[in-house]
Amino acid sequence: MLFSSLTFVWFFLPALALIYYISPGRKLKNGVLLMASLVFYSWGEPRYVVLVVLSILLNYGFGLALDGCGERKGLKKAVFILSILVNLGLLGYFKYFNFFLELAMSLLGRQGFAPRDIALPIGISFYTFQSISYLADTFRGENPAQRNVFRLALYISLFPQILSGPIVKYHELEPQIGDRQESLSMHAYGIKRFVYGLVKKMVFANMFGQVVDRMFDLPLEQLGTVTVWLAVILYSFQIYYDFSGYSDMAIGLDRMFGFTYKENFNYPYLSASVSEFWRRWHISLSTWFRQYLYIPLGGNRKGLARTCVNLFLVFLATGLWHGASMNFICWGVYYGILIVAERLWIGRILEKNPLKFLNHLYTLGEVAVGWLLFRVDTLHNGKILLKAMLIPSKGLWNPRIFADNRILFLLVLAVVFCGPIQQLMPRLKARLFDEENITAADVAVMAALLLLGTLLMVSSTYQAFIYFRF
């Protein structure tokens, strides 16, 4: 079930809100949310809800085992390592088994490899990382093991974030499961954020996505420089509005039920370096890797060389987390090299550069190349398109075939709303994210935007969120 579907917006969500708010007591409300989360997940993946339940039970048992080790550090560490291996093993089987087996067969020179029919369960990368957060926090003693299996189940499976995040660390969410306060203003703000996200998805992401798909389906050798740049720019905005729209919807949904999440995006296309871009893009994933991989590897505490190695490994893991293909591995390597280069010397050049707008152009150019690697089906296709981006060529297709006046108008709006207007008009930004004062004008705007989103849902074809693949 998609957040941007008529079934969810006009049936599932209103029914859940009604049942939730008439349910007395925190335990019953949590029970309603847990059942709704499992129903929500099973709506699209009925067979894999069993995997979610298995993950919950396994991690519940591992948490109790960690707690039961007491001061026996060796045993506790062994249990923790085993728990991580089990979680990564489940993720690895469903997400990486065919990729690594095919890679091994290729290296051994064996032909005729027939991959297994293994479907990727939606959201497995996200709820696996949340489970690891629980285990790591318990192992470190930052929180005791959760002895109520239903509360742990709610943390792992809470429906707003189970499919595509944000990835919420256990020590941030667990206190809210037991003690949170709902209010009319929180619910109203949640609706506002949800509607913002819905419009991002339906108006910008889906519209751009239709054009991008048409362009990438063409014979790539026929695309000229301007056309390729147009495709990459449109995809850059498609993925931003798609994923930030989902995050807005998830944050809004959780706010309706009394939860508070940290922001997952902070206007990444305003960044003046690639390092800054990754502090603003998919913040929950970046902070997860920082806390649970970069710092345990030594962070920046063991000298410059070790810091650079750790940074590179984090981005290699980031690429692999996104998908089982050489594209994503190379995408991670690409960013790893850029981040290390900025740490070694490019960062100093950017700091001393008096023409700061050039820093932004540098960042946007590097990010555009990154999105090209992210979008193409094969590295060979990426090589063809990268050559077209860098070496001027006319191509066989007129860019105006794809960028009609409607798309160009939306592109201008996309540029404005991805950051500049909030920077130039701070009062408007404050109004958009005001949680306390919901005025009649706000209600009217939200109603109009919800109507627009509904009309687009009725008339549009199915387009899943991009990050559902991961």
Where do the PLM segments sit?
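Membrane-embedded transmembrane alpha-helical bundles that form the catalytic cores
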Residues: 1-469
